[in-house]
């Protein structure tokens, strides 16, 4: 279950990547200036110098913080489930069956139980790594690569920006500068693929989701352990299901008659079937999804971002953009599980994933700055800093005519030299606020006034009733005598 902050940009309705920071202007030296929403809190000078070097490597190679009592309960339940499935099937099903079946030799028993116990050992070890390994935190003072945030523009576009900046130095040019990802909860920049987890109360590197069964976030430094844990759970549960089914079918008995299980065996067979079948179905489906994410090099949150981006492209809000982290099947798997296929399934192999979690390789044909520009922002979403809020003394949340939800799409416009009380009115389209960048019309657009055209006095429009099929219904009139 994912449990990240809704303000983090992971959900389609989130806006955290736009919160806290936005590009404001280009000065005469053509250097972007950054402004924060928390300047009033005394942080106006924080992280504005582009010459400050990036921070050191992230916090790695350390254990996570101690478990809380609720996390201890989740971990204990998980370990109890593994123990019940793993050991009850051996102690109360397979060993009694071995004792009363002469044809079931010790070599055959060892050939059945040794692989099963190796699978259990791999499950326990990978689960311990998932719980105790820190997913990765953003180092204090980290800053993005500022040169990668500036869009690649042609010479003509650059000359135009210089001319505009010289004429109006304070003109807002947000389209010319990309906003870096910023976490308003942590008051810090966010590296690519990192998100804020409100359960862990921090930004996690390459966050996939927060798993309550692990009592930990699945992130950059424990993602490989999580994939191996799912793999061994699937393989061992399937082996467990085949093993107890062989007992039910009496497959190890070379005699002709079937040896019926006793009452205790029957009870534990039912318990093992009741627990193993739901686990292998639920974890199996969950594993298939994460194996697919591994093949395309995406996280659970990034799959939501890709769906949101596809929706914006389909509606014409943004241009078609390529997902920057899909390197191909071979490179995608190597980036998570390690360089050699011989250690992909080895528990604990590749304890440290490739890279530091702050910067990632991108697909062919893309520049390194594409990872800082993913996911694309929705241009139709109003930025929170551009809203007009009422003063603290006002009892209303929005001042008059500033609520964006109640902004009508149609309004009445009056011609020049006329008052709103005049009976002569013209209806025209009222463009939504703010106007689209592709629309050449201004926000308040009135039709041009022709002085040679005399206004025509038209009577007021009479309200007309219409039936369910759209036909006009005459109003009721009194009976005439």
Curated annotation (Swiss-Prot):
Pfam family, one: DHHC
Residue segments, region Disordered: 1-22, 370-481
Intracellular or extracellular location(s): Endoplasmic reticulum membrane
Residue ranges of every copy of the DHHC domain listed in the record: 181-231
Membrane-topology descriptor: Multi-pass membrane protein
Record's function text: Mediates the reversible addition of palmitate to target proteins, thereby regulating their membrane association and biological function.
Name the record gives this protein: Palmitoyltransferase PFA4
Source organism of this protein record: Mycosarcoma maydis
């Amino acid at each position: 279950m994912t449990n990240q902050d809704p303000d983090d940009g992971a959900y389609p309705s989130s806006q955290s990547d736009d919160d806290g920071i936005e590009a404001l202007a280009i000065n005469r030296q053509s250097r972007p200036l950054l402004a924060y929403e928390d300047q009033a809190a005394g942080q106006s000078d924080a992280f504005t110098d582009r010459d400050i070097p990036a921070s050191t490597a992230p916090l790695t190679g350390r254990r996570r913080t101690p478990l809380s009592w609720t996390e201890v309960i989740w971990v204990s339940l998980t370990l109890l489930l593994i123990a019940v499935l793993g050991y009850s099937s051996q102690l109360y099903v397979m060993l009694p069956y071995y004792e009363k079946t002469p044809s079931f030799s010790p070599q055959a028993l060892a050939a059945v139980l040794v692989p099963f116990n190796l699978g259990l050992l791999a499950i326990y070890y990978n689960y311990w790594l998932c719980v105790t390994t820190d997913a990765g935190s953003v180092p204090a003072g980290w800053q993005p690569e500022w040169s990668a945030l500036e869009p690649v523009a042609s010479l003509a576009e650059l000359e135009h920006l210089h001319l505009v900046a010289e004429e109006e130095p304070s003109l807002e040019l947000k389209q010319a500068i990309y906003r870096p990802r910023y976490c308003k909860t942590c008051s810090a920049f966010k590296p690519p693929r990192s998100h804020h987890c409100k359960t862990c109360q921090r930004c996690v590197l390459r966050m996939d989701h927060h798993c309550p069964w692990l009592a930990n976030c699945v992130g950059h430094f424990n993602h490989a352990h999580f994939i191996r844990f799912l793999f061994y759970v699937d393989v061992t549960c399937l082996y467990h299901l085949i093993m107890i089914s062989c007992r039910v079918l009496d497959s190890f008995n070379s005699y002709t008659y079937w040896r019926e299980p006793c009452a205790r065996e029957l009870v534990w067979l039912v318990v093992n079937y009741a627990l193993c079948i739901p686990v292998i179905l639920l974890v199996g489906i969950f594993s298939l999804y994460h194996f697919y994410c591994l093949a395309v090099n995406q996280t659970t949150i990034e799959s939501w971002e890709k769906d949101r981006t596809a929706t914006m492209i389909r509606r014409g809000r943004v241009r078609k953009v390529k997902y920057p982290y899909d390197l191909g099947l071979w490179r995608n798997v190597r980036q998570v599980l390690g360089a050699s296929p011989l250690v992909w399934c080895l528990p604990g192999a590749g304890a440290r994933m490739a890279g530091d979690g702050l910067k990632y390789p991108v697909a062919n044909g893309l520049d390194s700055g594409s990872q800082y520009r993913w996911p694309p922002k929705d241009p139709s979403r109003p930025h929170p800093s551009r809203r007009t809020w009422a003063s603290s003394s006002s009892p209303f949340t929005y001042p008059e005519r500033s609520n964006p939800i109640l902004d009508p799409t149609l309004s009445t416009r009056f011609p020049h030299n006329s008052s709103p009380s005049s009976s002569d009115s013209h209806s025209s389209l009222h463009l939504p606020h703010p106007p689209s960048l592709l629309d050449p019309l201004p926000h308040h657009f009135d039709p041009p006034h022709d002085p040679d055209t005399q206004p025509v006095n038209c009577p007021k429009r009479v309200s007309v009733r219409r039936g369910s099929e759209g036909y006009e219904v005459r109003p009721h009139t009194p009976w005439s005598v």
